[in-house]
Amino acid sequence: MEISGLEWFRLHPTIFKEAWTDDEFVWPSRLPSFLVKVTADDGRYGIGEATSQIWYLGETGDQIDACLRAYDGALRGCDAENVALAHRAMEATVSGGMPGGRTTRSGVDMALYDLVGKARGLPVHALLG
């Protein structure tokens, strides 16, 4: 089962602060967030979420979008069931320290496990052990 491509959809979640005052923390009202869809050559797909804590990782929506574009090309043709190989392909394209890379890889990772679970008829928690 080979990866035929990635699709992503930008979300616009709103953050509601409960305990912090504006002068304590810089707390954005929105987070960079995407749903990530990894589709296999047989039509099956998995869904993941890539949401960054912008105040901690410093990753913007545009950076995540750029990484998703790079990963889309890098992952086409890769074995969808070999998650470690997919991570190597992503890291070879956009290194772990590049803004957007960590968040994006986590969303693709979730989508890959969802896809593999669907292909094997197993929930993701059974794959992870």
Region locations from a protein language model:
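Structured beta-strand/loop patches that form or line metal/cofactor-binding pockets in enzymes
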Residues: 1-45, 51-55
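Metal- or metallocofactor-binding catalytic centers and their adjacent structured scaffolds
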Residues: 5, 39-119
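Residue-level signal for pocket-adjacent positions within structured domains
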Residues: 15, 70, 122-123
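Short capping/connector residues at structural and topological boundaries
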Residues: 16, 80, 127-129
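Residue-level preference for alpha-helix termini and adjacent loops
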Residues: 19, 54-55, 74, 123-127
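Catalytic pocket of metal/acid-base enzymes, prominently hydrolases
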Residues: 115-129
